[in-house]
């Protein structure tokens, strides 16, 4: 059975988050959570929070054991972009693009129900 958790509008560039999400894909959920706790990056904290939510969804909504769960998919999708301007040289304005990401984590217990 598959269980998922979704965090939308995370204020971080998707490119920075994808490095971490690739590492946890295919690992046991508990092992991935321990691994993310050791990485000193903001993206690791955001992904770990979503992973904990997915584990809680599996335990509370579907009565699955946390020990049997595996990270099937850790997907970082592009979110909307906030367009801002910063003062530039000679009175001009320089555009700044503040990117957002959507984090989707899918866990599976190995059974195809």
Curated annotation (Swiss-Prot):
CDD domains for this protein: Ribosomal_L22 (cd00336)
A single GO cellular-component term on record: cytosolic large ribosomal subunit
GO-annotated molecular function: rRNA binding; structural constituent of ribosome
Entry keywords, A to Z: Ribonucleoprotein, Ribosomal protein, RNA-binding, rRNA-binding
Disulfide bonds: none
Pfam family, one: Ribosomal_L22
Gene3D superfamilies reported for this sequence: Ribosomal protein L22/L17 (3.90.470.10)
GO biological process: one example: translation
NCBIfam families: rplV_bact
Role noted for this protein: This protein binds specifically to 23S rRNA; its binding is stimulated by other ribosomal proteins, e.g. L4, L17, and L20. It is important during the early stages of 50S assembly. It makes multiple contacts with different domains of the 23S rRNA in the assembled 50S subunit and ribosome.
Quaternary context: Part of the 50S ribosomal subunit.
Family: Belongs to the universal ribosomal protein uL22 family.
Record's protein name: Large ribosomal subunit protein uL22
Species assigned in the record: Opitutus terrae (strain DSM 11246 / JCM 15787 / PB90-1)
Protein's gene: rplV
